[in-house]
């Protein structure tokens, strides 16, 4: 009988040690999960902002292209004085430069969207990993209490 009691005491001691370890690990894992979720939300916000910026840049590009087209048409229609022609050429060149700059801004906004999407993807993966770690500890903790 003493052997069985010793084994039970040893088993209880091991279970208690395991429970203590789980009690230490659980808050750490929950904190990591919370941090991962917060970071994921931040990246989602950044992605939404980058997408909105890209949309605004694309809309501005359309406006600049329309303005350039208008200036170009005016230039073609105007063939009066040299002064008017020079002014229209300068206006058309300015409009063309604005289109080029807007295209660059659209490309930068698109790149920002890609970067934000990648960061969100990484944050989401980290969140999943932290969630799995917490679930494993919860599972162990529940089964430890049943034992």
Predicted segments with their positions:
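Charge-rich amphipathic alpha-helical interaction elements
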Residues: 1-147
């Amino acid at each position: 009988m003493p052997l069985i009691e010793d084994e039970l005491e040893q088993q209880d001691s091991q279970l208690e040690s395991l429970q203590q370890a789980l009690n230490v690990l659980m808050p750490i894992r929950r904190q990591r999960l919370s941090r991962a979720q917060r970071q994921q939300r931040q990246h989602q916000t950044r992605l939404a902002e980058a997408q909105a910026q890209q949309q605004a840049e694309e809309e501005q590009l359309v406006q600049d292209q329309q303005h350039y087209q208008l200036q170009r048409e005016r230039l073609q229609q105007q063939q009066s004085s040299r002064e008017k022609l020079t002014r229209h050429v300068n206006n058309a060149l300015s409009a063309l430069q604005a289109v080029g700059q807007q295209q660059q801004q659209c490309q930068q906004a698109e790149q920002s969207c890609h970067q934000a999407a990648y960061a969100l993807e990484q944050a989401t993966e980290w969140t999943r990993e932290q969630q799995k770690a917490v679930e494993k500890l919860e599972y162990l903790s529940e089964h430890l209490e049943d034992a």
